[in-house]
């Protein structure tokens, strides 16, 4: 059950930059790390492989590809420039030509399916967006890859909006030239059997055929590469809204096949500073949760990495980082492409990014005739969600104009950062400031608009799970904010990002 986290998107460092302000809006992210607690030793059991590394089972060759010669694979590594160029300043509105990154007006035709293949999905994405597929993989015996992490990033650079869509590895789809299979087998089939464009090509076509989303660029990283990315950035501060406990190898150097080397590990709610190994565990583990919950945590790490890249001045380090990480990340984006995208950083914030997850009710658990447990798409529900994810959001524009200030009125470290992150998921830009006291028993929402827009006020209360009695009218023409939220000891940090889709 290996799955590299989505954070390898540093390969798209221009996209990382284009998602500027991620983490905590205009404010500096809290620096207090959440406690990491070792709970208990692993139970006695018969020796088994690590719960994250089941024995590899060689897949049978797809019958429709028996007569295709397996090619010698060439690496998809980008070519680094001999002497990295400096990042151009972004002091004015970007005038750089992004046309080379956008798709052509006419989308390429979908591959034809067999007579028993389902009808292809209607293409949902237009030429106004640039669509990236972020792939997390580990290399299997024999040199093949299994892509258990797939996140689609849809970027509208001119409109300063983006969407992220997590795809579960067990999604049951039609793979062109192969047939009905789990989506995480598409890349391997494309690599092994000479599909046009290799693994990335077949995965692109599979996503277009089943989800109706055109993929323009891809980036893939393995586990070791992910650790290196995080450590290169000096670690990452991840807002952990809900405590998370799962089995973890006590030390990365220990034998994962010895069950005594595992113990339950807990990350408490708070802003947790993670190195590469801890971030990898947090984003890929699922023994005590599910693939859907893992997708949520992967997007948490991805968002945090975006913000970390900016807070560590990575904009000016893009050429050097590109050179340093070129052997870690396989991508079709060149340094010039990334620098072009980096110019759009000032116009985007974390609140500009909407998070989507292909999970129930968009899929249902199903067992194939061969006995495989998969996730079957619920076509009507899934299509509606994908239409929303691939369309610019007017609600996001409205909410982004609302100024919300967050204060921590308690002695609980990082509470304001968690609330700000929660509002960012819902599309609200936030700013952090110091409270006048740390003994607020109950949270307070000060409405400086004097109820001019009750829908926005009620939305804030709903998102933060606060009662209407928390609202206080406080007209102040010089406030600089529309709403001030002072968090009290009654504030509950845990929330579900999928409930905040807007």
Q: Where in this protein do the model-derived segments appear?
A:
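Bacterial N-terminal signal peptides that target proteins for export
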Residues: 1-6
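Non-catalytic, solvent-exposed segments at the cell envelope interface
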Residues: 20-502
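Bacterial N-terminal signal peptides
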Residues: 9-17
